[in-house]
Amino acid sequence: MRIEIPEQKKLVLEARLPIRWGDMDAMGHVNNASYFRYLETVRIDWLWSVGCKPAPDGEGPVIVNAFCNFYRQLEYPGDVLVRLYVSDVARTTFETWGTMARADQPDVVCAAGGATTIWVDFPRQKATDIPDWMRQLLQA
């Protein structure tokens, strides 16, 4: 099953990450788990940059699903250019999407993925409304 990245989305961060030798598998290309790590790294960098840091005694984002579509292989050496987008802001959830391309071929998407994020009140272990300050960042 392939999940398509929506046309309507907001670019929130573009980052260049090194493809490490250890990211590859026995077949000589980047292992599929590494693509999820690239998406996670950029998603966390963006959340930290907007002041959304872990608050175990408060509230914050939790990933409830994640996916990745693979189109072309990434290989060492090189850098991966990850573009992170947000969309579909609801009361307690929003979507993040990422495209991954070689930095030396930024218009050739090698993989694209996403994650559904739910805002959680951690002490209660229940979904709660996305706070206004975060909603403004997501929708601006």
Label the model's feature ranges:
Residues 2-65, 121-140:
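Hot-dog-fold acyl-thioester-processing enzymes
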Residues 1-15, 70, 74-76, 86-140:
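HotDog/MaoC-like acyl-thioester-processing domains
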